[in-house]
């Protein structure tokens, strides 16, 4: 189990840039990009101290000492793209989310010798949505993760290791009404 604790030697810094733009009637665009840095000032003992209980039980953890300085699950960059076109009673949307490389701790309780710190690849998720309004009713449909990006490594015994979709594209459709 994870217990979050402020260890007093971590720092986080970054810069965020964003732009929203309406280049023509019924069309909105937005872009957001963030560069992040999050590290501990020192290597974490559970990955770097040969005398720690974790390293005594699984000495291969010591190979990840340098990577343990990175804050787990904290991407080096993130970004979003939003495009929306709404002519009359129609609505079309395309959204995207970028996740940069990050370090993820994998702590296996069943097999501690497989514990490690994984550096992920950068990935992008894409979503679409189309809707048509008929008075107070609307019909809509769309897809999430339409290119079916999946994280390349899955460990069902450690929910904290999930950093990207573990299932492919999800498609949906529906009807809504306004009172």
Regions found by a protein language model. Give the residues of each.
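Short amphipathic alpha-helix initiation/capping segments at coil-to-helix junctions
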Residues: 119-123, 130, 164
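Structural motif
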Residues: 86-87, 120, 133-134
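Gram-negative outer-membrane beta-barrel transporters
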Residues: 2-107, 176-178
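A generic, residue-level signal for flexible/boundary positions that often mark functional hotspots
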Residues: 1, 65, 112-114, 140
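Short, basic/aromatic-rich helical patch in the C-terminal catalytic core of site-specific tyrosine
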Residues: 17, 128-130
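Short, contiguous acidic/charged loop-to-helix segments that flank catalytic cores in large enzymes
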Residues: 6-8, 68-71, 113-120, 161
């Amino acid at each position: 189990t994870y217990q979050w604790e402020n260890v007093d030697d971590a720092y986080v810094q970054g810069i965020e840039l964003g732009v929203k733009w309406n280049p023509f009637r019924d069309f909105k665009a937005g872009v957001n990009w963030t560069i992040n840095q999050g590290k501990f000032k020192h290597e974490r003992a559970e990955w770097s101290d040969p005398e720690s209980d974790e390293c005594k039980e699984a000495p291969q953890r010591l190979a990840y000492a340098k990577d343990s300085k990175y804050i787990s699950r904290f991407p080096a960059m993130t970004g979003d793209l939003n495009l929306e076109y709404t002519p009359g009673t129609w609505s079309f949307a395309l959204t995207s989310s970028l996740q940069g490389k990050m370090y993820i701790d994998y702590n296996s309780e069943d097999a501690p010798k497989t514990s490690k710190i994984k550096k992920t690849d950068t990935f992008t998720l894409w979503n679409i949505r189309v809707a048509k309004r008929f008075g107070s009713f609307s019909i809509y449909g769309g897809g999430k993760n339409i290119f079916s990006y999946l994280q390349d490594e899955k460990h069902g015994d450690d929910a904290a290791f999930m950093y990207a979709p573990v299932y492919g594209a999800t498609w949906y459709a529906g009807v809504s009404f306004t009172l």
